[in-house]
Amino acid sequence: MPGLLNWITGAALPLTASDVTSCVSGYALGLTASLTYGNLEAQPFQGLFVYPLDECTTVIGFEAVIADRVVTVQIKDKAKLESGHFDASHVRSPTVTGNILQDGVSIAPHSCTPGKVTLDEDLERILFVANLGTIAPMENVTIFISTSSELPTLPSGAVRVLLPAVCAPTVPQFCTKSTGTSNQQAQGKDRHCFGAWAPGSWNKLCLATLLNTEVSNPMEYEFNFQLEIRGPCLLAGVESPTHEIRADAAPSARSAKSIIITLANKHTFDRPVEILIHPSEPHMPHVLIEKGDMTLGEFDQHLKGRTDFIKGMKKKSRAERKTEIIRKRLHKDIPHHSVIMLNFCPDLQSVQPCLRKAHGEFIFLIDRSSSMSGISMHRVKDAMLVALKSLMPACLFNIIGFGSTFKSLFPSSQTYSEDSLAMACDDIQRMKADMGGTNILSPLKWVIRQPVHRGHPRLLFVITDGAVNNTGKVLELVRNHAFSTRCYSFGIGPNVCHRLVKGLASVSEGSAELLMEGERLQPKMVKSLKKAMAPVLSDVTVEWIFPETTEVLVSPVSASSLFPGERLVGYGIVCDASLHISNPRSDKRRRYSMLHSQESGSSVFYHSQDDGPGLEGGDCAKNSGAPFILGQAKNARLASGDSTTKHDLNLSQRRRAYSTNQITNHKPLPRATMASDPMPAAKRYPLRKARLQDLTNQTSLDVQRWQIDLQPLLNSGQDLNQGPKLRGPGARRPSLLPQGCQPFLPWGQETQAWSPVRERTSDSRSPGDLEPSHHPSAFETETSSDWDPPAESQERASPSRPATPAPVLGKALVKGLHDSQRLQWEVSFELGTPGPERGGAQDADLWSETFHHLAARAIIRDFEQLAEREGEIEQGSNRRYQVSALHTSKACNIISKYTAFVPVDVSKSRYLPTVVEYPNSAALRMLGSRALAQQWRGTSSGFGRPQTMLGEDSAPGNGKFQALNMEASPTALFSEARSPGREKHGASEGPQRSLATNTLSSMKASENLFGSWLNLNKSRLLTRAAKGFLSKPLIKAVESTSGNQSFDYIPLVSLQLASGAFLLNEAFCEATHIPMEKLKWTSPFTCHRVSLTTRPSESKTPSPQLCTSSPPRHPSCDSFSLEPLAKGKLGLEPRAVVEHTGKLWATVVGLAWLEHSSASYFTEWELVAAKANSWLEQQEVPEGRTQGTLKAAARQLFVLLRHWDENLEFNMLCYNPNYV
């Protein structure tokens, strides 16, 4: 259970008090919690604080008060920690490698410390872990933790606030019994992931288990909760589905945008605390603005003290050179600039779903390891058949089987058609669990590397029954590509890894389903398919327009798709560079947008193009976004793509800054003045500045005990002795130890307990500090080579330029696709003057940096993704992005995959043991990139990028490189019809082929050959697929526990065409158990009855007695000869009309059969029936019939069938379809 734990035993300490103060600013949440725990044990123990995080939350402050000690954390370069850069081996007392202690400090209390806590790639994202050192008996521990989060939205557009479970744990009536049961269940579920939990075996397995246990407390605790709401617009209402709440307006509130929420009654401790906020304009784009901590003049002074600026200006002192340096430093100076946050939740809930227009790329990833043999594979086959038949003609699809290796049905996703569907059904019928162990990482990498299809969101369906030994890598891979890939996972059986199945869905905003023994897969598969087929706004991008005098860094860097209830979030860091531009043009604009992921791989953050005259004054003060209502799509589409493109081409000197991946850049609108904080607030300190003196209110320490080097803070003009002494979390927000703070020593004296080389202070907050000339940043060194040669100084600005620049006007354009229709929304905003308002409300605002935290987190994620993508292309080329992520992390005190939290005992001026280790850290890969690049170059083939997967991706015991296993027909076509590039690298590999050799050109060639192959084999595949599902044993004999004869609907579903129709033939009669004669006699179409009366073998109408016996088989309606009808009524009708009527009647009868004979399994075939009905609605019914007539005739058929089954005398001649 998360919270404060005994490091050795894993036991949780009871919570005695929880005080939560929070603020919602638009769609962002800033939260500060004060958690007090009591040590009721008589023995001291090592404390470990574990705090779970969701995908949109980051920790921005942490402090723990333990008696006379204060513990905080500091962000350090993970590579230096893991490489031994901070190794204290030279310290007189022995210690564990990687832990930093002050020289001469005894570490006797840690001599019996168990092994370190191991965090894999996934756990380090979703867990905050801090070592608190020794906690004395009967001692209270107060923990202050601050987080910033992006809030989720509901389909209605409401904003949801859910208090973390650690801050408000439940109190069960029988806590001991309940907790023990929960732990046992969690361990039993995921024994392959987590292992057994025994005292002294504290490791990553236990931490993973913690995530599956319910957070509870053995007793009631003191609970206080306060939430300030600063809405993006007027609030339509605030409610709580869990508690009665009280709403009060702050004394300084100017409108209904701001309100304060508290609990009206005492907390009941039996449920979480949830608040729903309803904006008055929930489906319009909203832009919110948060100012930086420096004015324009202050930033200019700060900039002149930076080493990269000094070096750059020596080479060329022109004004353009200065703006270039500012642009390249934007990620380091995020706290100093204004941040804009764009939020947009389109109204997809009110859209009437149209299944036939459902777009998407459906990829089915099926576990074919040996453990899937037997009943599990039979279940998967039936579920896959239903899933394939449920897809719509507008989509793309592919099937991939994986085990130790993997194979794909198609070289790339194919259009859903009769040909591809027939081949897929045939492949499913022959599928076996014969591919060895379980290795899901390699096929996932192959899927993610495939090009994204415009207008088709990638929807990945994963079916597995096992576990892998690299769950963290798998989840991190999917997390990094969640913008393009959404995962719906299915876990079969008791041995499946729950963390893997749930994690795949959680990190990609999909859904997870776990099947118990004997449970059917079809209803859960259809449930997920319905979610995937919901209305979607795909290819969502944001384009920003700013004046020429600004430099902007936008995030994220990838286009995304929005399903009902999801929102678009984007950030922009805006620097006003008007002081550094000579002769600026007021009508000149810059347009910031993004590239698609398959386009340029060059640096996009700093590449730009000019933009000509753009915004007019009248467009800069309004939000012109329209609600996203598909019924009013024409009104919502403010500007089509074509018109926008033509307009752009006519403008001169456009400037466009790109971000490497296809990203949505978002911008916020100016935030109106909100109510001040309801509680007294301390002086405002920037995020990265330590506020250790505030802790004197919780301890008996005086200022002398804080022996910390706070020179950077002193240089910024702040008096550390003047902070007001306030109590409670509402009085201040804890922060992390700033990068410039080191243990107190005489100036100039170095301590060995900290690093042998002092940490670089290139990004310290002191405007006058210069960066050291040694150890220049690798990022700055690399980019400096791209600078222009020295030239004469031209930075003299116009003397008449005003000292205070004019407000910055901007515009954001949100674009997306829905049903192949381009839609666009526009919102304008005004930034105002840069920097805080001195002496104003912002100085006392505790929540004035929430957007900065989230923007820095988004920028770091962008750099991490860019580094990963560049690393796949060429090892070593991603170094610049890794260093940029590292710089941003340390400058903004936001964690990244290249940095780590290091605990610091402030009162003793020393580091505590880090406790945490990262076995698969990306930082280690940074250190070994050169050696790894040589290894990859040796194993790469012809395309300039690695063609196989490394051994670390393989299943346990498999040390070979992974390859794409291409088996016999139908996938054997790859060996027969390969492109030249494929033959070159696959000829010597036999049945196995290289993983990544399907380049874009070779894929197009294979697809052409593949399509020809399908056309030649269409009839054979259709017949084989139908016979396979008709001839296989009944599933009822395997799984059915009841005598319901409606169970076997699979044979009928297997006959459905890709369009949704059914053919009237013998296979259809066999699947429905209805003789052809009865189908034709009861058909409302004349051609069907005439075909019976005109056959040479029959000369009279069959009697009721004949109908009760098995009639002879007849050819299908769509294939019987028309020659006997030449003399009849339909003799002149073309064959196409006869085939069409056969499809109409068979489809109506098929729907009626499902409803009549398999109603109890409606949740399994509902999409199949919906597709068939959708096809019917689009057809014209001949002979003057209507669809109502067809459905009535089908219902009458089953009335007659019931009479025939009961052997009742019934005169067929009394039935006339014309009277129905």
Swiss-Prot record:
Positions bearing Phosphotyrosine: 881
A UniProt-annotated Pfam family: VWA_3
Main location, first listed in the record: secreted
Compositionally biased spans, kind Low complexity: 796-807
Domain of life: Eukaryota
Region forming the signal peptide: 1-18
Alphabetical UniProt keywords: Glycoprotein, Phosphoprotein, Secreted, Signal
UniProt cross-references to InterPro entries, sorted A to Z: VIT, VWA_domain-containing, VWF_A, vWFA_dom_sf
Keyword Glycoprotein: yes
Region (Disordered): 715-807, 937-962, 976-995, 1093-1115
Glycan-linked positions: 140, 650, 1017
Domain called VIT: residue spans: 19-149
Compositional bias annotation for Polar residues: 1093-1111
Domain VWFA as annotated: residue spans: 361-529
Keyword set includes Secreted: yes
Gene Ontology cellular-component terms listed: extracellular region
Name the record gives this protein: von Willebrand factor A domain-containing protein 5B1
Organism the protein comes from: Homo sapiens (Human)
The gene coding this protein: VWA5B1
